[in-house]
């Protein structure tokens, strides 16, 4: 099963986000950003799916508190989550953020986890904006092609 599908299936079943991280650990090669890129693209797809645009943006204020309440980030963790959230929005907007340049200073191998947290928050926010259950948003997003990567 692909990283994208595993994340969407887990969200659709309302699996705890930390259990999702544990499920996805085997797909993450050490010292690599994968599957973070997959999760950022999924987050961008969620923005597209719910109709977020320059004319009708999805507010980021309170995103973590409203749509990822099970995660409490502190200090650098907040900055890492913020970067993943903004990188996903940048991808949705048509730019390609320089992930390697950014995550090198993190000095830890956890970018993919923050990308996962951002994707979870965006999928939940997109479902809320569309007025549908998260399960429905996940099913709709699963039908989109995404990437063929694992």
Residue ranges: model-predicted function:
Residues 1-150:
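Solvent-exposed interaction surfaces and binding hotspots enriched for charged
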């Amino acid at each position: 099963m692909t990283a994208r599908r595993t994340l969407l299936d887990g969200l659709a079943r309302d699996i705890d986000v930390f259990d999702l991280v544990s499920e996805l650990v085997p797909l993450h090669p050490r010292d690599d950003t994968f599957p973070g890129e997959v999760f950022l693209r999924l987050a961008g797809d969620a923005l597209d799916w719910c109709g977020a645009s320059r004319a009708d943006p999805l507010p980021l204020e309170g995103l973590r508190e409203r749509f990822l309440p099970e995660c409490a980030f502190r200090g650098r963790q907040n900055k890492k989550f913020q970067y993943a959230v903004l990188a996903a929005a940048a991808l949705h907007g048509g730019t390609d953020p320089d992930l390697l340049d950014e995550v090198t200073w993190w000095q830890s191998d956890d970018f993919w986890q923050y990308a996962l947290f951002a994707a979870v928050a965006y999928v939940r926010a997109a479902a809320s904006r569309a007025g549908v259950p998260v399960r429905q948003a996940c099913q709709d997003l699963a039908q989109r092609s995404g990437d063929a990567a694992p």
